[in-house]
Amino acid sequence: MTEIREFWDDVARSVAFLSRIPVPDRHFRGHDGGLGRAVRAFPLAGILIALPAAVTAVLLGAIHASSLFTAFLIVAAQATVTGALHEDGLADTADGFGGGRDRESALEIMKDSRIGTYGAVALILSFGIRVSALAAFLPLLTPTGGGVALLATAALSRAAMVWHWSRLPPARRDGVAAAAGAPEAPATSVALGSGVILALVLFFLSGIPTVAVLLSFGAFVLAVLSFTRIASRKLGGHTGDTIGATQQLTEVAVLGALALAI
């Protein structure tokens, strides 16, 4: 029972860290604020966070609403629940990578709360690609299948965050990610394994063809590996912003692959 209680505490802490969803205080009693073990619950937390978007897809699909309108509301629901946390990370990362002459200037730019040209373009592309991809493939699935596919994507993109976080050292010692601690090796393995398994099961239940599932997993791997390598070269490590950007980029990659393959 203790293990089960600890796991659900980790789920609750992960939901609180990754979203604006209020979580009861009891899950944080005696907790030091570290997420080294809690990251094992990121994929499941991602599914819970994506439930409002999935319900939106099911309900609007059931009444045959416009696919473009449905896609916009799905992405809006996701951003509302997370407080656009991951989008903020993507924008800051784009500004830092695009405008920084070196590691120090990139990190300084990423700390600036103001959005620049690179960040604005990154957000436009992220929202645009996700909306257009959803509008392309959701009409080809049942309403329930579309909602379940969103949950699968959420599990994968949160697993990607853990992999990126675990593979790189902190780029700065005073950042949010550094304060949360490094993911523990067993927790990282659980996050990756559960993320992949949950996504596979959910994609199967959604009715997505096997070829499309394989292509989406290929896009997932390519996105997280490529971006982690770029972050290592640019910053020599990760930040909270690059972890958030990892979620966005892998979600874009998976949804784009599904739109191409279904």
From Swiss-Prot:
**What's the Enzyme Commission number for this chain?**
2.7.8.26
EC top class, as a word: transferase
Q: Which InterPro entries match?
A: CobS
The UniProt keyword set, sorted, is: Cell inner membrane, Cell membrane, Cobalamin biosynthesis, Magnesium, Membrane, Transferase, Transmembrane, Transmembrane helix
Q: Which GO terms describe its biological process?
A: cobalamin biosynthetic process
Family, as annotated: Belongs to the CobS family.
Under which name does UniProt file this protein? Adenosylcobinamide-GDP ribazoletransferase
Q: Say which species the protein is native to.
A: Sinorhizobium medicae (strain WSM419)
Q: Encoded by which gene?
A: cobS
